[in-house]
């Protein structure tokens, strides 16, 4: 487990906005459960924007705001209209990548730009509805323990222009984008967001110029460039990896960071069990009651 670092943050009164998105099937499988856990456990001062696609989730708290994704995200609709029927944007890489990547070209998520565009366009719109910090949280997350404002603020150090969950230092790795924070008052963060959006709006000259085009890879590509220009970034998992990850996977870092005190992330096949595996996913035992329940 990464050692906890006390992050003194003078902005105790800063506005914190979180954002997530899901479709109808996602709402039934994990999304509503996430919203209910947020309403129960997260401090009321922290707002959650929910971009709902073709569904009507229940907001059981005044700090949860439901937004119709199709109405609020015209750029996402345009992106899907343009790329929705194009194989390379939907998990089928072009032949040159198939030739270059015999071991992993079949892993469709790496080239599914349309699927992951839902996340990034929700972020781009939420930026316009936020003031100080914007935090992305995947909808297959579960807030298992009370999360106070003070503890939440500590995860967003004002000296950093971005926070993220890394997967090690090997050049092939990309962040685990289930949770990240954007310091909107910082000029470098604004530069990052402008380039992030450009990569999608000018896709042929943006995401499709990269080796992979899922959102985490695009995020990591821009981050790796801009952190050399301004190294004031905060990696929640910096203390986890003694050795560099051999591939981009890097295990299940989020729950092994300080964030695991409050949230679980049911990424991939974990959605069916509705909980990460204590035996397989935790690097060391955690003291929180959630991780010790039968």
For each feature predicted by the language model, list its residue ranges:
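A structural signal for well-ordered alpha-helical segments within the folded catalytic domains
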Residues: 29-32, 117-121, 213-221
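N-terminal anchoring/stem segment of glycosyltransferases
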Residues: 7-105, 128-130, 184-187, 270-273, ...
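Conserved catalytic core of nucleotide-sugar-dependent glycosyltransferases
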Residues: 144-212
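GT-A fold catalytic core of metal-dependent nucleotide-sugar glycosyltransferases
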Residues: 111, 115-165
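Short beta-alpha junction loops
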Residues: 52-57, 141, 168-169
């Amino acid at each position: 487990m990464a050692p906890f670092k006390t992050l003194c943050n003078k902005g105790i009164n800063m506005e914190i906005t979180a954002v997530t998105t899901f479709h109808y099937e996602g709402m039934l499988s994990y999304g509503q459960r996430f919203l209910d856990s947020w309403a129960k456990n997260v401090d009321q001062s922290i707002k959650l924007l929910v971009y709902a696609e073709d569904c009507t989730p229940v907001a059981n708290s005044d700090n949860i705001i439901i937004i119709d994704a199709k109405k609020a995200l015209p750029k996402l609709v345009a992106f899907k209209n343009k790329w929705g029927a194009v194989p390379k944007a939907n998990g089928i890489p072009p032949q040159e990548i198939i030739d270059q990547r015999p071991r992993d070209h079949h892993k469709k998520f790496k080239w599914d730009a349309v699927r992951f565009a839902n996340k990034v366009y929700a972020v781009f719109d939420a930026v316009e509805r936020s003031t100080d910090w914007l935090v992305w949280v995947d909808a297959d997350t579960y807030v298992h323990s009370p999360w106070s404002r003070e503890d939440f603020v500590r995860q967003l150090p004002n000296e950093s222009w971005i926070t993220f969950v890394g997967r090690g230092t090997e050049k092939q790795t990309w962040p685990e984008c289930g949770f990240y924070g954007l310091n909107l008052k910082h000029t470098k963060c604004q530069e990052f967001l402008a380039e992030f959006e450009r990569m999608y709006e000018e896709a042929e000259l943006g995401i499709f110029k990269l080796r992979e085009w899922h959102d985490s890879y695009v995020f990591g590509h821009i981050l790796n460039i801009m952190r050399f220009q301004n190294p004031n970034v905060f990696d929640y998992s910096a203390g986890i990896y003694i050795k560099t990850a051999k591939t981009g996977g890097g295990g299940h870092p989020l729950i092994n960071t300080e964030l695991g005190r409050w949230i679980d992330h049911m990424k991939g096949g974990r959605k069916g069990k509705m909980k990460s595996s204590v035996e397989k996913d935790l690097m060391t035992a955690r003291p929180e009651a959630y991780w010790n329940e039968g």
